[in-house]
Amino acid sequence: MTPLDHIRNFSIIAHIDHGKSTLADRLIQTTGGLTAREMSEQVLDNMDIEKERGITIKAQTVRLDYTAKDGQKYVLNLMDTPGHVDFAYEVSRSLAACEGALLVVDASQGVEAQTLANVYQSIEYDHEIVPVINKIDLPAAEPEKVKQEIEEIIGLPADDAVLASAKSGIGIDDILEALVKRIPAPKGDINAPLKAMLVDSWYDPYLGVVILVRIIDGSLKKGQQIRFMQAGTTHLIDRVGCFRPKIEILDSLGPGEIGFITAQIKEVSQTAVGDTITDAKNPTSTPLPGFKQVQPVVFCGLFPVDAADFDKLKESLGKLRLNDASFSFEAENSAALGFGFRCGFLGLLHLEIIQERLSREYDLDLITTAPSVVYHLNMTHGEGSIDLHNPADMPDVTRIDSIDEPWIEATIYVPDQYLGAVLKLCQDRRGIQKDMTYVGGRVQLLYELPLNEVVFDFYDRLKSISRGYASFDYHQIGYREGDLVKMTIMVNGEVVDALSMIVHRHAAEGRGRQMCQRMKDLIPRHLFKIPIQAAIGGKVIARETIGAMRKDVTAKCYGGDISRKKKLLEKQKEGKKRMRQYGSVDIPQEAFIAALRMGDDS
């Protein structure tokens, strides 16, 4: 075991694409964790999606041995944390496992919204934060301006910020020295009962569930009986080790150390992130603070384009859940789309990642219904309140007293030339402006928004109106009552359940008209007229009609009596009327997919 004063636990906080994973690679290379031949780009990002999108999804850890300039040997534990808002809870647990953080800011881009959220969390944990200004070798780099931003926006002294370029290897030694000198050593008591935090877990086909732990007090050894305090389950440890970044098996882990254990656990859902691990025979009296059960925030339906793929989809979702307990799914049946699953996600990025992994790793073609959030329905006649996940399941309006919807607080950074467009977008989405601050050439906006308005296409719209320069971060602030209604779309008088949605009463007409217009453009013409209607309850609020294809039944009448033509036209009219009653409208898959991707022109 390493003495406490020679351990440093730190995480790297950075916005997407500011060079976090590249910096981690350089630190591993410099301390000799891997030889030059073994180095691959972004060692800690294992999934292809992580590498391609330049994001980190799961927390990873690596132990580095570093000999400082004063000749002392130190063990540095690097926690590579996710940077995205959907994984905010995973981030908070990873940060809680450390004593300090490197704040990496791109010298050409400056401070962004996600950086801020994680920095404030780190400050709450009383961490020592070392600012690192990365990419200083870029032609557009402005290190002095970025230093000023760090001081003005975050309130951290940045005069001793380390200037570096992870790609070129500039300033890496300065970063390592700053870690040793400025980040405090962990505290802990080896003789106290075992207390360790479960930081993250993932499924390995050979080892079962691998659990990432940070020891607070006591020690962990192979063969020890441990207990998860929140889950209440006991397990026998069969492996203890750490990542360098290759797996290294150890005899034990002591206070302040970060490593992994395996205990023949088969499902990730048994290991909740943030749980306290203690000794089964000699338990600690109090669990660690801050534990939360992660709840899905955004729901949507996933349906296979080919109905024969249903079993394959079910199996694929099961495999993904092995590695991601925060994702939930249950079977559902839709009259329009057939059999599929209703899935719950932490947020929009989470939904996108799962969708992309299903199509890429499992080769599935999917239709995704419009994402929706969880509404609280307060019922009349003392029925209490129920949670609504799927708009199609909404009970009769007469039984509902009021509907509460989730709200978020959003922080938006935008260059001042795009401010007007962003303010209009937030206003259109029922936003309430809380604060507006000018920092240099950029504006920091604080808005309260209904989550329902954000999940649809807010992020894409924000990026397009600001030419990609705006950054956005949010957290939930609770539920508020809203004037919400269920809007259904009817084609030829029949309700299409997959297109039902809950909207604000004021936005219903515009959204309904848009939906009908889009369906009109996409459904092919039939031999009879097809009405497409958007309705709230029994009231139709928008309508479009697809004209019938006309066959010229009078073509064979040359001259002659007009009554002959009239008779044929009347006969055709009767036939069309009968057709409209009994004919079924064929809605192509493309129409569904396009109607559900409303965001393109809203």
UniProtKB/Swiss-Prot annotation:
UniProt keyword Membrane, yes or no: yes
Binding site for GTP: 17-22, 134-137
GO molecular function terms attached to this record: GTP binding; GTPase activity; guanosine tetraphosphate binding; ribosome binding; translation elongation factor activity
Top-level EC class as recorded in UniProt: hydrolase
Keyword Signal found: no
tr-type G domain: residues covered: 5-187
Annotated catalysed reactions: GTP + H2O = GDP + phosphate + H(+)
Membrane topology: Peripheral membrane protein
PANTHER family, alphabetized: TRANSLATION FACTOR GUF1 HOMOLOG, CHLOROPLASTIC (PTHR43512:SF4), TRANSLATION FACTOR GUF1-RELATED (PTHR43512)
Family assignment from sequence similarity: Belongs to the TRAFAC class translation factor GTPase superfamily. Classic translation factor GTPase family. LepA subfamily.
The protein's name in its UniProt record: Elongation factor 4
Organism (species): Zymomonas mobilis subsp. mobilis (strain ATCC 31821 / ZM4 / CP4)
Gene encoding the protein: lepA
